[in-house]
Amino acid sequence: TTQIPRSAADDFQPDVTADTHVGAVPSAVPPKRPNADFAGDPTREPIAFDSPREPAMDSAAPEDDIHLIPGASIAGGRYRLLVSHGGPPALQFWQALDTALDRQVALTFVDPDRTLPPGQVQEILTRTLMLSRLDKPGIARVLDVAHTGSGGLVVSEWIRGGSLKEVADTSPSPIGGARAVQSLAAAADAAHAAGVALSIDHPSRVRVSIEGDVALAFPATLPDATPEDDIRGIGAALYALLTDRWPLTETGAPSGLQPAETDPAGEPVEPRAVDRTIPFQIS
């Protein structure tokens, strides 16, 4: 692969080019970055929206299969898909354009391949609905939760910044990384107090905002997610920022992070063993 110079994390602005317009379908090779990561961007201003409601089991009649490709329009043309961000099994994460409000959003498709029982899809949506009550920098604001003809859809605000992999590639300082994950830990604490887990189960779930907060960018709580899983996920996010590697088992679409090196017992080596400059207290 071609090596490119690493920029400072504070200079990192990873979104689609400024020539993306409402009504224009991206080319076959979609822009890699949306144009939202700039100070004063109106997409960060509060907008009026109906609070997410409990999704009904007897939703509308099944639609044709949704083709999740860049440029595709869904929900009657309301959202245009821009960039796929992967995801664990049964979920797909997309960056999209809300064509009605001309702002970027994060879309989480729940069971788009229809492999889960309907009751399990309902449980995911019900748990995710509980996250809509949280207002923390460490979680994207949930704007809508709904059934579709092929599963479910969670619409969230778009976290401007970079993916965990992109920011880890800039070699942020250990202290900066430790501070950044505090926002995710605070969001998890609030979610656990409300009786729900965040489901931090995949590197692509997490983004680092331009404000420097590590956040759950694609909310959708799986039925088997636990607070203990979240604690491991928070630790894994910090590990990735420190070492550019992922210490947990990764399933689903690859995030680009390499797996962590392991010790003779099969456990991930401590970050300090990878980089001796990492303070012992953080490692």
What are these regions (language model features)?
Residues 145:
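Activation-segment/catalytic-loop signature of the eukaryotic protein kinase fold
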